[in-house]
């Protein structure tokens, strides 16, 4: 994204959507949010927030990537000198943002998985972010997390949803969002949250 700040932002977690994770989604379609009547797993799939196994799998995959990367850097600091020196800046935040163009749940499923209506996309985004942060904080209690308020999930979440204090939200009000004017969306966020 190229935005600057006191710490680097991680961006979309497309890196999670490979190998074992994607295979697990394909083997367990109820883990995938029902998008346009389909639970087909692909690189834009997001976890079904109504399925605890799905949200746990997402959080575990991110935690494992973080642990593996940290162990690699700290296991050979001379080989990874630049990454080691810049570790706190680049990895102060653990990215928990779904893949770009994520297929959020929008279709009621009356068959195998559940018959629950999905809330709006920003509610799904921040429900998943809260669950993910809460789970990963048990292993990395000093970490902060990063998500975007962007595109179809740019809107402020419903009043019933709070955002974990360890989650930093990067508001992107000018790209692909249809909620309101850029300043209108900014004002709604700033009036409600300090994340």
Which role does the model predict for each range below?
Residues 1-195:
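Catalytic-core regions of glycoside hydrolase
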């Amino acid at each position: 994204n190229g935005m600057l700040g006191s710490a680097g932002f991680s961006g979309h977690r497309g890196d999670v959507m490979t190998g074992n994770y994607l295979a697990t989604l394909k083997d367990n379609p109820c883990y995938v949010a029902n998008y346009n009547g389909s639970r087909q797993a692909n690189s834009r799939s997001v976890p079904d927030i109504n399925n605890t196994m799905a949200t746990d799998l997402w959080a575990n995959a991110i935690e494992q990537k973080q642990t593996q990367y940290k162990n690699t850097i700290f296991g050979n600091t001379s080989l990874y000198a630049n990454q080691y020196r810049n570790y706190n800046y680049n990895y102060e935040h653990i990215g928990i943002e779904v893949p770009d163009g994520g297929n959020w749940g929008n279709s009621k499923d009356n068959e195998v998985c559940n018959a629950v209506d999905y809330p709006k996309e920003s509610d799904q985004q921040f429900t998943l972010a809260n669950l993910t942060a809460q789970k990963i904080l048990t292993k990395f209690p000093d970490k902060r997390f990063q998500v975007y308020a962007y595109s179809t999930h740019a809107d402020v979440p419903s009043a019933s949803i709070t955002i974990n204090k360890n989650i930093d939200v990067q508001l992107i009000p000018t790209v692909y969002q249809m909620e309101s004017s850029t300043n209108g969306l900014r004002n709604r966020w700033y009036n409600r949250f300090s994340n």
